[in-house]
């Protein structure tokens, strides 16, 4: 009995001692805590991996962006050098044009002086048998005479008996001035050859006078002044052609009737009122302009259009940074395209940059694709930027003649078929005037701005660095996916990457703004040496592990 009670007591004690351990092993709270600990450890490892992946992705993105800017900087420097060479070539060409124009003007002066002497003699020695011009004309017109025919014949014989048959007044004046041609060329041709024979094919009177006189004066003096200067530069301010013709022929009166009026009365009193110069010369030349345009129109076309085939002068000057011929790329178009389009077959620089940097272009030839490869892939298929700029500036298209040849022809021939670049440059350099943009300004605007309508290069680069085209995924999204969709940190990551890219765009704009005034980006801009502004996010994770752990443990009591 005693033994049984002892055994029962021991069993009870053992049971009581085991109960706490059993209860402890089966405690659900402890299991929950252990599960939470294991979950937090696993979460910590996963978050660490995610943050490390994000950090690596951002670092890699920063390297790629830096490579892009290095490529853009190199491209900009090389392009600047090529553009500088192009500008130097333009300067040399313009110097040659200036020398050619000076020689042409000097020769024109000599010929004009000869013409003035000829006219002087023709006007002063009307004829030994004839009375003075004032008397001769009334007798010639009113007293028909035996040998006196029409006024054309009368003037013809009076000024030197240039022919036996009564040639028209245009021919008479042509021969009277020195028989500048064997066949009665049109008045425009006559004046053209009299001034120096600037062209093999007789250009119209407008062109003839334009080239003959050289457009003396900055603001292109009126036609009256032009003819006045061409005949001898009788005055500094150029008296009106009425006075010029009056004094040149005989000084028939003190006030000098207008040329139209003088010829009008001399030819037979075609009207009581002095007709305009265009009509006067038109009638005086024997109505040489039933087929030809009136002198007024001729002068207008000569200065503005240079004939129906020639572009209007306004367009010519506009295209003087614009378009000078149908076959050759007109100078304006040449310069504009040299910094903008480089011809129909050349890559348009503005579009090229925009497409090349933003959309990588659809065709491998375009300048934009060159920039794209030059900045990112060193141009495996696209031509190098050097070649692109070289072709754009120096050749302006395969069909356009080189600038040197153009200037050479410009100073020497002024083009037999198409108005060669020289003629265009002559118009652009000579008649640009104070109202037209100077050539230097035109080139400067053409190279640096490519027109007010063209987007600035900085704008293009900004889009290139910031958007990389509408079709390309944003850099922030790319890094986001590359890192593995970190989750709630996505917005902050995208924002930081966006800020970094925007800052890079600002640096690119600063680079272009720094390179803009000089016409070439020879100095290294900020984008070349600038690291990613969001470098803090590149070199360290967005949230430290210790901070994350504290935030997790703070929710556990």
Swiss-Prot record:
Region ranges (Disordered): 150-175, 422-441, 464-490, 509-533
Main location: secreted
Record keywords, A-Z: Secreted, Signal
Biased composition range(s): Low complexity: 153-175, 476-487
Signal peptide span: 1-23
Pfam families documented for this protein: SBSN_GxHH_rpt
Keyword Signal attached: yes
Disulfide cysteine pairs (residue numbers): none
GO cellular component, one term: extracellular region
Location(s), subcellular: Secreted
The protein, known as: Suprabasin
């Amino acid at each position: 009995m005693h033994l049984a009670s002892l055994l029962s007591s021991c069993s009870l004690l053992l049971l009581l001692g085991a109960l706490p351990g059993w209860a402890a092993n089966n405690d659900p709270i402890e299991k929950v805590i252990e599960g939470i600990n294991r979950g937090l450890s696993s979460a910590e490892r996963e978050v660490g991996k995610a943050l490390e992946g994000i950090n690596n992705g951002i670092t890699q993105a920063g390297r790629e962006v830096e490579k892009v800017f290095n490529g853009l900087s190199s491209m900009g420097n090389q392009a600047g050098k090529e553009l500088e060479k192009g500008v130097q070539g333009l300067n040399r060409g313009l110097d040659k044009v200036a020398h050619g124009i000076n020689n042409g003007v000097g020769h024109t002066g000599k010929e004009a002086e000869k013409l003035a002497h000829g006219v002087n003699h023709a006007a002063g020695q009307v004829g030994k048998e004839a009375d003075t011009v004032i008397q001769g004309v009334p007798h010639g017109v009113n007293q028909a005479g035996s040998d006196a025919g029409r006024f054309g014949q009368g003037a013809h014989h009076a000024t030197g008996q240039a022919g036996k048959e009564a040639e028209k007044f245009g021919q008479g004046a042509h021969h009277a001035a020195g028989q500048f041609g064997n066949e009665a060329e049109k008045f425009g041709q006559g004046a053209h050859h009299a001034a120096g024979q600037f062209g093999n094919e007789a250009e119209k009177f407008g062109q003839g006078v334009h080239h003959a006189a050289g457009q003396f004066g900055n603001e292109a003096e009126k036609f009256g002044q032009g003819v006045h200067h061409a005949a001898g530069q009788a005055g500094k301010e150029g008296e009106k052609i009425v006075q010029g013709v009056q004094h040149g022929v005989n000084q028939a009166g003190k006030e000098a009737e207008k040329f139209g009026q003088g010829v009008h009365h001399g030819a037979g009193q075609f009207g009581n009122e002095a007709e305009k110069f265009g009509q006067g010369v038109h009638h005086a030349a024997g109505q040489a302009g039933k087929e030809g345009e009136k002198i007024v129109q001729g002068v207008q076309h000569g200065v503005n259009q240079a004939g129906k085939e020639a572009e209007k002068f306004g367009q010519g000057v506009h295209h003087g940074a614009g378009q000078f011929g149908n076959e050759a790329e007109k100078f304006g178009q040449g310069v504009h395209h040299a910094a903008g389009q480089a011809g129909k077959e050349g890559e348009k620089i503005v579009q090229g940059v925009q497409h090349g940097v933003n959309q990588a272009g659809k065709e491998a030839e375009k300048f934009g694709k060159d920039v794209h490869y030059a900045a990112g892939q060193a141009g495996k298929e696209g031509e190098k930027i050097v070649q692109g700029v070289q072709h754009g500036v120096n050749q302006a298209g395969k069909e356009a003649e080189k600038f040197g040849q153009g200037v050479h022809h410009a100073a020497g021939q002024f083009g037999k078929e198409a108005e060669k670049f020289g003629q265009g440059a002559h118009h652009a350099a000579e008649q640009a005037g104070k109202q037209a943009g100077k050539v230097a300004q035109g080139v400067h605007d053409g190279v640096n701005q490519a027109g007010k309508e063209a987007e600035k290069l900085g704008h293009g680069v900004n889009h290139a660095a910031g958007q990389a085209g509408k079709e390309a995924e944003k850099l922030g999204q790319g890094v986001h996916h590359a890192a593995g969709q970190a989750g709630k940190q996505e917005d902050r990551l995208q924002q930081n990457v966006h800020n970094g890219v925007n800052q890079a765009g600002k640096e690119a704009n600063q680079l272009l703004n720094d390179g803009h005034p000089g016409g070439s980006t020879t100095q290294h801009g900020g984008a070349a040496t600038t690291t990613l502004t969001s470098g803090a996010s590149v070199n360290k994770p967005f949230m430290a592990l210790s901070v994350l752990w504290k935030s997790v443990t703070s929710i556990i009591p």
